[in-house]
């Protein structure tokens, strides 16, 4: 439901499962309703977790956007990467969400490649 809501439903489920299995880190935010559990936010990372990691597939269901959930996902991911000792993280994003990552302190690639960089202190 989340992938459909954010327009990513074109990915075959089998391939998505394989990507998740091979990810370094997976984070999900669930709506707590025992009648209808719903994944409302998600993000994942790939990489070695020491020198580099790449953040992928950050998504928040449109009904829950604007409530700080995207920031919570990114804060959790960066805290986990710091804990692992990761030196650098990169991400790739659609142009419409680049201001979100700028507000979180990511350095955006100046040549318009839709990617950003984060460096550990």
Segments predicted by a language model, with ranges:
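Conserved acetyl-CoA pyrophosphate-binding loop and the N-cap/start of the following alpha-helix
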Residues: 64, 68-76
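Conserved short alpha-helix immediately C-terminal to the canonical SAM/SAH-binding motif I
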Residues: 73, 97-100
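Conserved catalytic-core motifs of GNAT/GCN5-like acyltransferases
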Residues: 90-92, 102, 107-121
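Short amphipathic alpha-helix that is part of the acyltransferase structural core
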Residues: 1-14, 32-36, 112
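Conserved GNAT acetyl-CoA-binding A-motif
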Residues: 74, 79-94
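A conserved beta-strand-loop-helix scaffold within acyl/acetyltransferase catalytic domains
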Residues: 14-59
């Amino acid at each position: 439901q989340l992938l459909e809501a954010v327009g990513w439903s074109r990915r075959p489920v089998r391939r998505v499962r394989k990507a998740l299995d091979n990810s370094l880190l997976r984070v999900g935010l669930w709506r707590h309703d025992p009648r209808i559990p719903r994944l409302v936010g998600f993000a994942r990372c790939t990489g070695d977790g020491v020198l580099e990691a790449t953040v992928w597939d950050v998504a928040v269901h449109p009904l829950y956007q604007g409530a700080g959930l995207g920031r919570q996902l990114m804060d959790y991911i960066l805290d986990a990467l710091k804990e692992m000792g990761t030196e650098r993280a990169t991400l790739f994003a659609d142009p419409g969400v680049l201001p979100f990552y700028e507000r979180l302190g990511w350095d955006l690639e100046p040549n318009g490649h839709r990617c950003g960089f984060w460096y550990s202190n």
